[in-house]
Structures are given as structure tokens and as C-alpha cells.
Amino acid sequence: MSVANEESYRPSKATDATTEAVPPPMSYPQLFARFLKFGLLAWGGPVAQIDMLRRELVDEERWISSKRFNKLLAVMQVLPGPEAHEICVHLGIRAKGRLGGVLAGLGFMLPGFLLMFALSWLYFQIEFVGTALGAAFLGVQAAVIALIVRAVHRIGEHILLDRWLWVIAIVCALAAIGRVDFWITLPAGGLVYALLVLNHRASALLVTLAAVALAAAVALWAAPTAKLVEAVVQGQASVLLIFASGLKAGLLTFGGAYTAIPFVRNDAVGRGWMTDGQFLDGLALSGVLPAPLIIFATFVGYVAGGPIGAVAMTVGVFLPAFAFSLIFYDRLEAVVENKRLHAFLDGVAAGVVGLIGATTIDLAQVTAERVPSLTVGMSIFAAGLAFLYAWKNKLNVVVVILAAGLAGWLVFPNQG
């Protein structure tokens, strides 16, 4: 579609005077610079980021009406991807067509990407083992577990709205602990919930039994070939494979960036690209940056494949966030109105919550084994979790990570 045709996406002034708000006239560089500023100020996670966008672009400048913004937010919360970034892309399209959407999305993500890229490079220039900095990162890793636990709670509050969604989440968590692949549990969870919403309980039971049978068949087939597969995939990190890993995570981030954690970890740690300790360090670094937390994928890509790997992973993770708005701009609101599709996505999202819970247990076990003192590690975890709930501020994550690093430096000297 040409840029001229894309301008038709903008409502007319007459429409603005009667029913709808309109973005102000601006050039493409001005649009990019505006969202670059938002990216530089994107502290505090999605809630703070969305609040910033709402305050400036809805309440103050009326790029879009409050009612339509709320509906747009509801759509973005159903679809995979970081909501704040997707809203930026959508508003960029509203202002200057699809090219405007690309520029708005790039502006919002670029500061976080460049900062994480620089930190990833610095991470490998510094000695950690047996140093005070290594000890500080042990403290930080305990705090990261607290961040994930709080995220599971907050995401679950918005997704697990009835008993069946709770059941799906618990079953998917148990299945993940039992090493059942997500490509079995998540579609099954979505189908089962959609059928239950339609009151087709017999069909839901059949889908459940089919999923159990498939999981058993895969387990039986995989058992004799597991060592062969492990030998093939261990350490391999081609650019295409890194990109595919990021794309998979980007397509499955229902409910926020934290939901990408189990999928990225499954590939990065499972394939031998990095250790769990490095994975937790990447999460910690992303927590102190003005960016969507999913920017930790840049660090994972850097560890797996250097600078090119960092770019490949980042492109893969963010591609769905661009694509949904760019391709389906006019039809996104229909997602909320389609009850069957909405129910399926709700079931998948509930399953993802279960996967995060299972991954949190795994990461907590790894951290417990790494810290020199389990008591001190648990104390840092408990203090960080309590602070996150007690202090409602967009910088609370940054403060917790820095404080945990200081605590690790003080109590785990030369233990990194």
C-alpha cells in the first residue's frame, strides 16, 4: 500500500469535531522522535508505559478517544506481544499510516535495544567468577525470582478469571514439570476452554484425552532418541535458529513480556547456548533498563550468537508485535468481539501462566543451588518480593535489583 493511500487511515477533521480524536499533523521524523522519547522514558514495566502513553496521547493530545483506547488496550491484552509496544505501532499507523507504525514501534524499542546490546557486550568483558561483581549478581538472581513470582501473580489475576482457567493453568504447569512439550498443552488448553465456553463438555473431554495420548506417544518416541537429539542440538546457534526461537517467543507472549520466559529459556538453556545463571543475569539487566522486559531476548541472542545473534533474536521477538497491527489494523477490534477466538486465546493464555509457574520453580531451584547461603538467598528473595508489593512506583524493579546486587556484594564476597 502506498503512503498516500495509508493517509486514509487518519480520520478527517470533520470526524474529529464530532466523534473522534485525531493525531496532530507531523512529519515522519517528528513521529519517530516522539516515540523515541517514550522509549527513553519507558521505566516501570507495561503498566507504567501504558499509563505514560495514555496520559500524553489520549488525555492531553487526543490522538485517540479514551473509549477507543480502552478497547484497543483490551485487544492488545488478548494478543501476544508487549502491549505498550503494540499500542505504539497502532497509534503510529493512526498518525501516518503503516510506515508511521513501523517508525513508532522502532522509536519505542530502540533505546532499550541499544542499551541492552551495550550491556551484553560489557557483560563478556568483565570477569565474574570469584569477584565481587559475581557475588553481586548472585544477589540479583535471587531478586529476579521475586520479580517473576510477582509477575505470575499479577498476570494470573488478569487471566485466571474462572475455575476452568485455573484448572488449565495447573494442568499445564504439571505437564511442563513432567517435560510435556508446550505445543501439545497450549493448543489443547485453548481448544478445551473454547469448547467449555460453548458448553460442549463431551468434546472438551475428547480433546483432553487426545492431548494425553499425544503426549504419551511423543514421550515413548522421544525416549530412545533423546540422546541423539541432544547431541545434535547442543551448542548449535545458527542465526536462523536464533531468529526462530525469538519468533516463537514473540508469538506466545500472552499476558505480558514475562510469559516469554519459559519459551526463550527452553531454547537458550535447553540447547546449551547459555546457562541458567546467565539467563537470570539477562533478566536482571532488562529490569534496570527503560524498555519492555522482553528486551532480555537481545541479551540471550548476544550470548547465543554474538552481535548478529542479538539482532536476530530481537527481530524475531518483536516481529509479531509489529505484524499484528500492520496487517490487521482495521480488524483488531473484531478479536474481542469474536467469542470463540477470544475463548481459545484465553485458554492458551491460562496455559502460558502455568508454564511460567513451572519455569519459576526450575529457576528457583537453580538459584538455590548457586547461592553460597540458602538462608541469605531466601532473605533477599523475600525482601525483594515484599518491597515490590509494598512500593507502587515505576522504579521499584530498578531499586530491588540494585539493592539485591548490593546485598550480594556484601554477604557473598568473592563468591560469584
UniProtKB/Swiss-Prot annotation:
Could you tell me which InterPro entries the record lists for this protein? Answer: Chr_Tranpt_l_chain, Chromate_transpt
* Induction line: By chromate.
Q: Name one GO molecular function term.
A: chromate transmembrane transporter activity
UniProt key word Membrane: yes
Q: Give an example GO biological process.
A: response to chromate
Q: How does it sit in the membrane?
A: Multi-pass membrane protein
Under Pfam families, the record lists: Chromate_transp (PF02417)
**Where, if anywhere, are coiled coils annotated?**
none
Q: What does this protein do?
A: This protein reduces chromate accumulation and is essential for chromate resistance.
Protein family? Belongs to the chromate ion transporter (CHR) (TC 2.A.51) family.
Quote the protein name from its UniProt record: Chromate transport protein
Originating organism: Pseudomonas aeruginosa
